[in-house]
Amino acid sequence: MDRETRMRRIWETILEIPRGRVASYGQIAEIAGIPRGARQVAYALRHVPKDMTLPWHRIITASGKSAFDPLSRHFRMQCERLTEEGVTVRNGKVNMQEFRWQPDLDELLWKPSSMWDES
């Protein structure tokens, strides 16, 4: 699978995360069909087209923390956006047991989408 296809799959997977839920980099990679691809998710997030609105703030580490420096503008923005969606952020951390996105497998497999269209 080429880089463009991987990035498209990652972006489309991220678009499926509902408000008030979060996912880890590794979880997104697995759902997008890129096992052990957490770093590729980070790469795709750094290369989102300017005209694409992506809920990037819903992607956090597997431990529930933001990947951004706690003193950075992006860290503050991520925490603010998650809080606005009803996600509790305490000391820069989200309780993954409570807020982790648990997608329905049937929906992921059978929902009409261009996600798996290789053409």
Segments from the language model and where they lie:
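Nucleic acid-binding interface residues in structured DNA/RNA-binding domains
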Residues: 1-119
